[in-house]
UniProtKB/Swiss-Prot annotation:
Similarity comment: family membership: Belongs to the acetokinase family.
Cell location: Cytoplasm
Protein name per the record: Acetate kinase
Organism: Gemmatimonas aurantiaca (strain DSM 14586 / JCM 11422 / NBRC 100505 / T-27)
Binding site for Mg(2+): N7, E395
Length: 412
């Protein structure tokens, strides 16, 4: 089955075409035909493509909106120029969509129908920055491919619906949860699920035999405690703002600071929230950038004090969460790193692991340095009681597989 995977944002569209079926999934032999992204939708859009032969291309096109972008994309991936071997729109058998928020309604990936669309619309107030664009992505794919091609919604929050009540509730008046569904939802769920699946494959362990802490570290960051294949706690909360220090997000913060900062700086509550989301984290502390690569260079080569401070705060917060999740699960088999920073910053991994010797985690410096650029493997020492791994996340592959399972062979 040829599956188009879409991740629609406000002015961006990430995509991939994956060939998968039951046999390919069982053998881990799914085929990725093409991937890329379209940026600056609404003007002169920039399109980045990774073709089947491994080559990369960039081009521009005037794409006025998301519908035009999806229509262009479908036309390109079914053209001879793309090299996919697909020659007609009918060769795309299904579309899998990343949807950020599924509320409490969606515990699994689901085939889209009118009821599902209404459910996603009802969660817009929980994810106003993401779900409207995810919905428009579904509508654009329907317009480009017709109602006969099934669409599947894969929710970032679904994996965390297994959190126990004592982990997902906030210690605020209980009626607020009953009336407004104020609770921890967690995000990056598809990524954490992907990491856990791949870790089990690499180690040959069954779901029931695995306790791991997964760290998705990129511009957005989150930690997850996974026991017996299920998420039992996660760092992001009602919104993605809670938890770890991130590229531009503050993470955990005293709630009383919102009013205090607003009063002192003359900012409204939405302005304070915007500051915590887009001007804080690594960027806010360093005053330089939210890019960990640049911060490491500033700290190591130019001895910039605030760059070093931002890195230390980032690693300290992550280490605290790992320690708390080890306590919550009564220990763990491994700490598993993923995401752009987790997969490519050995120094950051080492700093996070540095304070975990008490738990039996000891790293091999040479192995750690070697694991960059998509490499996967263990970098703890032989026999370490708590292992450390790098396992690149593959959300698009998981979305494609969920899409196949949701629609089955009947769509082909």
């Amino acid at each position: 089955m040829n599956i188009l995977v879409l991740n629609a944002g406000s002015a961006t569209l990430k995509f991939q075409v994956v060939v998968t079926d039951a046999q390919r999934i069982a053998a881990d032999q799914d085929e990725k035909l093409i991937r890329g992204q379209i940026e600056r939708i609404g003007g002169e859009s920039v399109i980045t493509l990774r073709l089947p032969d491994g080559s990369s291309r960039k081009r521009t096109a005037a794409l006025r909106d998301l519908r035009a972008a999806v229509d262009w994309l479908v036309g390109f991936v079914t053209s001879a120029e793309s090299g996919t071997g697909l020659s007609a729109r009918a060769d795309l058998h299904a579309v899998g969509h990343r949807v950020v928020h599924g509320g409490e309604q969606f515990r699994n990936s689901v085939r889209v129908d009118d009821g599902v669309l209404r459910g996603i619309e009802e969660t817009i107030e929980l994810a106003p920055l993401h779900n409207p664009h995810n919905l428009r992505g579904i509508e654009a794919a329907r317009a480009a491919l017709g109602d006969g091609v099934p669409q599947v919604a894969v929710f970032d929050t679904a994996f965390h619906q297994t959190l126990p009540e004592h982990a997902y509730l906030y210690a605020i008046p209980y009626p607020l949860y009953r009336r407004h569904k104020v609770r921890r939802y967690g995000f990056h769920g598809t990524s954490h699920r992907s990491i856990a699946y791949r870790f089990r494959k690499l180690t040959g362990r069954a779901k029931a035999d695995v306790r791991i802490v997964t760290l998705h570290l990129g511009n957005g960051c989150s930690a997850c405690a996974i026991k017996d294949g299920q998420s039992i706690d996660t760092s992001m909360g009602f919104t993605p703002l809670e938890g770890l220090v991130m590229g531009t997000r503050a993470g955990d913060i005293d709630a009383a600071l919102l009013d205090y900062i607003g009063a002192k700086e003359g900012l409204s509550p939405p302005q304070v929230e915007a500051m915590l989301n887009s001007q804080s984290g690594l960027l806010g502390i360093s005053g330089l950038t939210n890019d960990m690569r640049d911060l490491l260079a500033e700290a190591n080569e130019l001895r910039d004090r605030r760059a070093r401070l931002a890195i230390e705060m980032f690693c300290y917060r992550a280490r605290k969460y790992v320690g708390s999740y080890l306590a919550a699960m009564g220990g763990a088999d491994a700490v598993v790193f993923a995401g752009g920073v987790g997969e490519n910053a050995p120094e950051v991994r080492a700093l996070i692991c540095e304070g975990l010797q008490w738990a039996g985690l000891h790293i091999d410096a040479d192995r750690n340095q070697a694991l960059v650029g998509g490499q996967e493997g263990r970098f703890s020492t032989e026999g370490a009681a708590l292992e450390a791994w790098v396992v690149p996340t593959d959300e698009e592959l998981l979305i494609a597989r969920d899409t196949y399972r949701a629609v089955g062979d009947g769509a082909v």
